[in-house]
């Protein structure tokens, strides 16, 4: 009897060590299913922590967060993030000019400690606060994110002409130099045909060219980053010229969420890693399938950043994943969408499916399901980032997380990857001699 138990214990230790999964099971959680056969599914050579470069932790900060959400740059866990994507700048469809969308939030608002009597021309708002975080945390970098779902219809026209692409790149880089960004993130959702996919490649090429020129103006060695938010749905990523795009990109932020929602007829998982062969309706998309496509087009593992939602999508009047539903109900800021910090809802049973790496909470009396990532599932996703050397994690968006020490998903992911010492080490830039703002240009660095 003792020998049998010893074999079981040793076997369990070997399996868990191989998987590098770290998780804790709360009282509200159901027992995990096992899906270890998935671990051999990638036809790639596993790397170690992003190819030896460390992991990237990337969070979107939205410029409207300072209003009803009461979330400011000062709330960001800057010592635990390598990159923040400041969202969103827009594009003028007639010219390609990139411009800020909320001057009050972006550059004008005076936060506590900001003087009204500073001499010269100075930037304030979220931009100044983020720059101060850069000064205190030299591994913390800020990228200007352009586009997003609301503004993406403005890309196609300027991207289709040489002049439009040049204007886009020039004005984006000008904002970078004026405001002290470390790079540009482009979120075009989505090119609709091969012509637009080709235009996208040429747009990235032009932005990369002008970023390279901006780098040469610096006394110290610096590399300005170029990244994209990329789709996880086959109907969108199959249109992209992935291999051609990849040569200009530092990394890809995979939007591994919104796999199911109010637009569907069936309640499903919104951020599952694997598809469910026994319940196809519940998993119309999967992170696994998307990653295989990008890797199959030559993208290195360590350039793929795995998106993690800091929110849940609700379905009313349903029996659960794979069943019909009737409406989505209320939400934190929009119907059917709940901030992670508001989850799980009361009287909901939390379900973790380790076979799919998917989780949800369900209220059987009300027939309400909310698909969201629990700390247990995020820890398992971090385990796969470790196992296969993916580049790190990305979160939409920072205001919705729980505080560190209270089941924060950002903290959970980082801890499961090995902690802060596993972060990629790449210094930010503090040298912007061409900035029109005195408090950016005249910084002693």
Task: Identify what each model region corresponds to.
Residues 3-19:
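Cleavable N-terminal signal peptides of Sec/SRP-targeted secreted and luminal proteins
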Residues 21-176, 408-411, 415-444:
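Glycan-recognition patch characteristic of GH18 chitinases/ENGases
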Residues 53-55, 80-82, 138-142, 180-182, ...:
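Short, well-ordered coil/turn segments that N-cap beta-strands
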Residues 58-59, 95-121, 189-345:
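Substrate-binding surface in catalytic domains of secreted glycosidases
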Residues 63-78, 160-178, 234-245, 287-291, ...:
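Short, acidic/polar
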Residues 84, 144, 186, 207, ...:
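Conserved, mostly hydrophobic/aromatic
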Residues 147, 184-189:
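Mobile, glycine-rich extracellular loop/lid and propeptide segments
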Residues 331-390:
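Hydrophobic, secondary-structure "cap" segments at the distal end of domains
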